[in-house]
């Protein structure tokens, strides 16, 4: 089955999204899931797919059913980024399945997995808690130079508008601080 997927598309092939389970199912052991991902990556490379074109989903399990599910995913994501140098994704809301205040748990999980090296997520990007988690994680990881996106998103509109009016009245322009 993997061979047929790796040959689809010819020279303009699409990225390969791989899930880290095999014919035995989803293991609770992060080492086994990492090993499965490694096999998939190596096999895909045999077909000419570069690691930059491979996205691995470590498979997020519900934390309410498996209390180590969050820690397992973060461990796997870190290994995938450091050892295999592949991009990662996950269904972020799977972690909170069956629990109250899912958005809060999902946001905490997403920020922590970004810290572990997650490069993309299947989630609701319009939910305020998720947006806050992603923007905050980008700052903490050094991906938001001078916190510009954060400030732009969360600056009080009245303060920003007042400062702009004052600058126009006095003829001053805002200058970037080196």
What are these regions (language model features)?
Residues 163-178:
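Terminal or standalone catalytic/regulatory effector modules within metabolic enzymes
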